UniProtKB/Swiss-Prot annotation:
Region (G4 motif): 183-186
Location of region: G3 motif: 100-103
PROSITE patterns: G_SEPTIN
Name under which the protein is recorded: Septin-11
Organism: Macaca fascicularis (Crab-eating macaque)
Gene of this entry: SEPTIN11
Length: 432
């Protein structure tokens, strides 16, 4: 049986040349084919005040008309509404989810406006973490709802960021890739727009807000990303209406004083935003979400559960050691709880026994009292019975005596009557 032996990390690997074709040069093609068959997902969070143009910009970015309900300024609080769509361009399928912050900035008290947004982002991280922690995972078919990009719409005031913007971006920068954009940029003069951009970036830096940094470490995108980064925040204009300009139709906004073309880089930064968000850095946004923001959330959650990479002496911990340590800790807590429950049970039993003994004592006392009362009542009844029996006997004796006297009287009366009768019938009495 072959045993794999780990190489030291500092040992250099030898470069070998192949004597013939093997076939692993098709790995990029395999990866492309697999990714194409699986499709991709991309989730955008649009944060901005009601009526600032979030829905219009999404329609313009993806060159389609998404469902959207007209929002009012009467929302009692901020709520997030997510809608998913299946898009296809050539043979590439994209599952796009757009999350809108309905009612953001409409309340008088805006202190907690950021909380529903943070809770939503954390909820998506938690759902993915729970799927990862399952024994039988199914990440292949899992619909990833983690937010990959946050387009933060800044009102075109021309002065500075609102306190709500600073607070919200500061709360979100460790959880999502923030791309600040100035909405309705056609309402600001060009010279004021440059000052406004500089002011926004200065305030973000001074308040420690970390926005998404376009990657410059890859040669293929380094130059374009470095060039585009200086234009942040992007000043955009959105429109789905087409206006005839010269001999062709173009997406634009028609004003009495002229036309603002959406895809004209001299008019706004819409094309730059589309290039950076979709055509150049979409995969990097997805990767940053997983490797940076989600990993931070995952690490914090696992540390809350007691899992760490190092022990108190900063020595590396393996997952098995962490598991055993937590298992022993939980077993110790379980035994402690069992002992506490046992002692509590014994105490409850003793208390119940004392209550039962007290109740038994009270019952015995009541029984003895009832028994004595019964005996006393019985004695009274027996005494009364004896008195009645004596009275009956006396009565019977008197009755017998009376009857005897009556009988004697009757007998003596009968004898006297007979004597008188005999006297009358006697012959001697007649001679006389």
């Amino acid at each position: 049986m072959a045993v794999a032996v780990g190489r030291p990390s500092n040992e250099e690997l030898r470069n070998l040349s192949l004597s013939g074709h093997v076939g692993f040069d098709s790995l990029p093609d395999q990866l492309v084919n697999k990714s194409t068959s699986q499709g991709f997902c991309f989730n955008i969070l649009c944060v901005g005040e009601t009526g600032i143009g979030k829905s219009t910009l999404m329609d313009t970015l993806f060159n389609t008309k998404f469902e959207s309900d007209p929002a009012t300024h009467n929302e009692p609080g901020v709520r997030l509404k997510a809608r998913s769509y299946e898009l296809q361009e050539s043979n590439v399928r994209l599952k796009l989810t757009i999350v809108d912050t309905v009612g953001f900035g409409d309340q008088i008290n805006k202190d907690d406006s950021y909380k529903p947004i943070v809770e939503y982002i954390d909820a998506q991280f938690e759902a993915y973490l729970q799927e990862e922690l399952k024994i039988k995972r199914s990440l292949f078919n899992y619909h990833d709802t983690r937010i990959h990009a946050c387009l933060y719409f800044i009102a075109p005031t021309g002065h500075s960021l609102k306190s709500l913007d600073l607070v919200t971006t500061k709360k979100l920068d460790s959880k999502v890739n923030i791309i600040p954009i100035i909405a309705k940029a056609d309402t600001i003069a060009k010279n004021e727009l440059h000052k406004f951009k500089s002011k926004i970036m200065s305030e973000l830096v001074s308040n420690g807000v970390q926005i998404y940094q376009f990657p410059t470490d890859e040669e293929t995108v380094a130059e374009i990303n470095a060039t585009m980064s200086v234009h942040l925040p992007f000043a955009v204009v959105g429109s789905t209406e087409e206006v005839k300009i010269g001999n062709k139709m173009a997406k634009a906004r028609q004003y009495p004083w002229g036309v603002v073309q959406v895809e004209n880089e001299n008019h706004c930064d819409f094309v730059k935003l589309r290039e950076m968000l979709i055509r150049v850095n979409m995969e990097d946004l997805r990767e940053q979400t997983h490797t940076r923001h989600y990993e931070l959330y995952r690490r914090c959650k696992l540390e809350e559960m007691g899992f760490k990479d190092t022990d108190p002496d900063s020595k590396p911990f393996s997952l098995q050691e962490t598991y055993e340590a937590k298992r022993n800790e939980f077993l110790g807590e379980l035994q402690k709880k069992e002992e506490e429950m046992r002692q509590m049970f014994v105490m409850r039993v003793k208390e119940k026994e004392a209550e039962l003994k007290e109740a038994e004592k009270e019952l015995h006392e009541k029984f003895d009292l009832l028994k004595r009362t019964h005996q006393e009542e019985k004695k009274k009844v027996e005494d009364k019975k004896k008195e009645l029996e004596e009275e009956v006997n006396n009565f019977q004796k008197k009755k017998a005596a009376v009857q005897l006297l009556q009988s004697q009287a009757q007998q003596s009366g009968a004898q006297q009557t007979k004597k008188d009768k005999d006297k009358k019938n006697s012959p001697w009495l007649c001679t006389e």
